[in-house]
Amino acid sequence: MINVGIIGGSGYTAGELIRILMYHPKVNIDFVYSTTNAGKPLSVAHHDLMGDIEMNFTAEINPNVNVVFLCLGHGKSISFLKENQFASHTKIIDLGNDFRLNKDAHFEGKDFVYGLPEINKAEIKKTNYIANPGCFATAIQLALLPLAKHNLLNNDVHINATTGSTGAGVSLSETSHFSWRNNNMSHYKAFEHQHLGEIGESLVQLQDDFDSELLFIPNRGDFPRGIFATLYTLCDDSLEQLVAKYEEFYKNEPFVTVTTTNINMKQVVQTNKCIISLLKKGNRVLITSIIDNLTKGASGQAIQNMNLMFGLEETTGLHLKPSGF
């Protein structure tokens, strides 16, 4: 069995990790670390776990676990790792943004690999250290990578993506209160969202002359989980040619489905799936990409990476079905 530790155990991504890992056939959850809830049952923070798992939060870490998931606020993983040493064999998967960019990937002798399996699977299998991608970054990259592979990203890309309230984290803020978020929408960080950097680096990895603008408008939705992203750009390929290229690119990727039908977010919520829909009008291509921000956009993808790191089928423990209604 793979002994797992979870750091920052009170948040949404940690709760999603626990929800999936408690049924993973190859995993034992060794500890869930939270200084604020130490000694209390996991169900104090994760009410959906009541009656399903008898385990308490702890303020002590086991440095000898096989893998540790860092579910800390952005910028906090570095300080945690400086203050807490793990065994040399312990694999680390960081769900924050501390190590995602190339310039940040090397830390105290550890080289973090960007954990997007659809382009970095071989490297993920060999590494002990993963920088898990951001949620928006995952949906957007999966929408664009086949175009980059064929050097078709030669014009500005217009991106509009809406995320659920869980994307803001468990701590309350002015824009996460029910009275503000319900029956409401707003955009934020227009043209300057922090995920743009990691998206750009992955696109250049496949299309080395990529220098077009990614004009990204992120939106806050009034639903709890999921990302619905629409992207459009110019492309001379026919719809049939594009579908063939996308299907070829993702033919060995079990969590990505390509279609030309209309799609809706409920098709992926609470799963590790990404569904991509293609539409063509003249020389414009519309790409719609949907994921669950907590699963494929965070915890599910982290488990997918863990599976690859330990030589398991990447789908192990991730055969999850959306409710659809």
Curated annotation (Swiss-Prot):
GO cellular component, one term: cytoplasm
Lineage: superkingdom: Bacteria
Active site feature: C135
Entry's Gene Ontology molecular function annotations: N-acetyl-gamma-glutamyl-phosphate reductase activity; NAD binding; NADP+ binding
Presence of keyword NADP: yes
Keywords: Amino-acid biosynthesis, Arginine biosynthesis, Cytoplasm, NADP, Oxidoreductase
Record carries keyword Nucleotidyltransferase: no
Subcellular localization: Cytoplasm
Pathway: Amino-acid biosynthesis; L-arginine biosynthesis; N(2)-acetyl-L-ornithine from L-glutamate: step 3/4
UniProt cross-references to SUPFAM superfamilies, sorted A to Z: Glyceraldehyde-3-phosphate dehydrogenase-like, C-terminal domain, NAD(P)-binding Rossmann-fold domains
Pfam families, A to Z: Semialdhyde_dh, Semialdhyde_dhC_1
EC number: 1.2.1.38
Reactions mediated catalytically: N-acetyl-L-glutamate 5-semialdehyde + phosphate + NADP(+) = N-acetyl-L-glutamyl 5-phosphate + NADPH + H(+)
Transmembrane spans: none
GO biological process: L-arginine biosynthetic process
Record InterPro entries: AGPR_AS, AGPR_type-1, NAD(P)-bd_dom_sf, NAGSA_dehydrogenase, Semialdehyde_DH_NAD-bd
UniProt family annotation: Belongs to the NAGSA dehydrogenase family. Type 1 subfamily.
NCBIfam families, A to Z: argC (TIGR01850)
PANTHER family from the UniProt entry: N-ACETYL-GAMMA-GLUTAMYL-PHOSPHATE REDUCTASE, CHLOROPLASTIC-RELATED (PTHR32338:SF10), N-ACETYL-GAMMA-GLUTAMYL-PHOSPHATE REDUCTASE, CHLOROPLASTIC-RELATED-RELATED (PTHR32338)
Job description of the protein: Catalyzes the NADPH-dependent reduction of N-acetyl-5-glutamyl phosphate to yield N-acetyl-L-glutamate 5-semialdehyde.
UniProt-listed HAMAP family: ArgC_type1
Protein name, per record: N-acetyl-gamma-glutamyl-phosphate reductase
Organism: Flavobacterium johnsoniae (strain ATCC 17061 / DSM 2064 / JCM 8514 / BCRC 14874 / CCUG 350202 / NBRC 14942 / NCIMB 11054 / UW101)
Gene: argC
